[in-house]
Amino acid sequence: MSLWFLVFLSVLQGVTELFPVSSLGHTLLVPALFGMHIDKHAPQLLPFLVALHLGTALALLWYFRERWIALIAGFFASLNGRKNDEGHLMWALIIGTIPTGLVGLLLEKRIERVFHDLRIVAAALIINGVLLWLGDRIQRARAHRPPEKLTFKQAFFVGLAQVGALIPGFSRSGLTMIAGNAAGLTADKAAEFSFLLGTPIIFAAGLLELPKLFHAPDQLADALLGGVLTAIAAYLSVRFLMRYFEGRGRLASFGLYCVLAGLFCLGWFMFHAQPV
């Protein structure tokens, strides 16, 4: 793998995993526009992609480190019968993780095979953009509550939204922010809940494949560099996004980008052969 391509993929993963624009969709579409095909199950790429997932998860853990310490403390307090907001939120995050964990393990590879056509990925990106616009409309129409007041049923619903991101072109963070808006969270709190909810999912995606890092010792240097670059990009991304939504930023801005990018890619691959 060339150095420029390593840097490109690392930064692309770190940014698009957290921005509501579909990391998997971009990983497939952007290289294809330059005539390259990315097979994330290729043996030579697996160690590298494992490191990218771990880099993203570590960036999220570090950014929300104080929040996670409070959540874990509240969780153990709840086990001792002491009800508290942090413990309730931790249980909500656990419940929200269940749908994607189960569906992802059972169906992820099958779904990817069905949606391998880049024109379908581009169409999904367009739909993702429309949903982001609708999410803004929903958020402004709902009464607001803090994440600690989400019911477990609402947390499960938000977690269920992540399942849609198994389809390339749909964004995990985008879908969970929309679901959070529907549950009554403000834009910044929906973003925070989305990132907290996504951390164990992203971590698990890396940890499950971690042994493959050590089956390719000749690629460890590339994987380490990629992981570090992704962690930096992801940290800067989550920092920007939290400030953006705290400053009354809107999902519709990302929705417009997704629609325009999806239309461009759809038109491109209607008239150009897809790389194999």
UniProtKB/Swiss-Prot annotation:
Membrane topology of the entry: Multi-pass membrane protein
A UniProt-annotated Pfam family: BacA
UniProt GO BP: cell wall organization; peptidoglycan biosynthetic process; regulation of cell shape; response to antibiotic
GO MF annotation terms: undecaprenyl-diphosphatase activity
Parts of the chain that traverse the membrane: 1-21, 44-64, 87-107, 114-134, 150-170, 190-210, 222-242, 251-271
Catalysed conversion reaction: di-trans,octa-cis-undecaprenyl diphosphate + H2O = di-trans,octa-cis-undecaprenyl phosphate + phosphate + H(+)
Its EC number(s): 3.6.1.27
Protein's UniProt keywords contain Ligase: no
Keyword list, A-Z: Antibiotic resistance, Cell inner membrane, Cell membrane, Cell shape, Cell wall biogenesis/degradation, Hydrolase, Membrane, Peptidoglycan synthesis, Transmembrane, Transmembrane helix
One cellular component (GO) term of this entry: plasma membrane
Compartment list: Cell inner membrane
InterPro entries per the UniProt record, alphabetical: UppP
Function: Catalyzes the dephosphorylation of undecaprenyl diphosphate (UPP). Confers resistance to bacitracin.
Other noteworthy facts: Bacitracin is thought to be involved in the inhibition of peptidoglycan synthesis by sequestering undecaprenyl diphosphate, thereby reducing the pool of lipid carrier available.
Entry's family note: Belongs to the UppP family.
Protein name stated in the entry: Undecaprenyl-diphosphatase 1
Organism whose genome encodes this protein: Burkholderia pseudomallei (strain K96243)
